[in-house]
Amino acid sequence: MSGNTGERPFADIITSIRYWVIHSITIPSLFIAGWLFVSTGLAYDVFGTPRPNEYFTENRQEVPLITDRFNSLEQIESYTKSI
């Protein structure tokens, strides 16, 4: 025998007008905020990733791969100096 937890059934929640009034505003605004976050380039600044035109510089046209496991710090420093 199961008890009642006092919560509203999910079907009642998604069929209520109040739910759709709130979510018809919040869902599109979250989508627009995410689109603006990415399209303005703020995502690159926040997460520190290079922009698509910054992957290869004029001085360095090869892919910066770490090949020597024991001297990896020196390789990383040489790659970051050329940026």
Swiss-Prot record:
GO terms for biological process: photosynthetic electron transport chain. The keyword Cell membrane does not apply. With its partner (PsbF) binds heme. PSII binds additional chlorophylls, carotenoids and specific lipids. The chain crosses the membrane at residues 21-35. Its main location: plastid. Belongs to the PsbE/PsbF family. It is found in: Plastid, Chloroplast thylakoid membrane. This is Cytochrome b559 subunit alpha. SUPFAM superfamilies: Cytochrome b559 subunits (SSF161045). GO terms for molecular function: electron transfer activity; heme binding; iron ion binding. Heme binds at H23. It is a single-pass membrane protein. The keyword Signal does not apply. Coiled coil: none annotated. Pfam families: Cytochrom_B559 (PF00283), Cytochrom_B559a (PF00284). This b-type cytochrome is tightly associated with the reaction center of photosystem II (PSII). PSII is a light-driven water:plastoquinone oxidoreductase that uses light energy to abstract electrons from H(2)O, generating O(2) and a proton gradient subsequently used for ATP formation. It consists of a core antenna complex that captures photons, and an electron transfer chain that converts photonic excitation into a charge separation. GO terms for cellular component: chloroplast thylakoid membrane; photosystem II reaction center. Heterodimer of an alpha subunit and a beta subunit. PSII is composed of 1 copy each of membrane proteins PsbA, PsbB, PsbC, PsbD, PsbE, PsbF, PsbH, PsbI, PsbJ, PsbK, PsbL, PsbM, PsbT, PsbX, PsbY, PsbZ, Psb30/Ycf12, at least 3 peripheral proteins of the oxygen-evolving complex and a large number of cofactors. It forms dimeric complexes. InterPro entries: PSII_cyt_b559_asu, PSII_cyt_b559_asu_sf, PSII_cyt_b559_CS, PSII_cyt_b559_N, PSII_cytb559_asu_lum. Keywords: Chloroplast, Electron transport, Heme, Iron, Membrane, Metal-binding, Photosynthesis, Photosystem II, Plastid, Thylakoid, Transmembrane, Transmembrane helix, Transport.
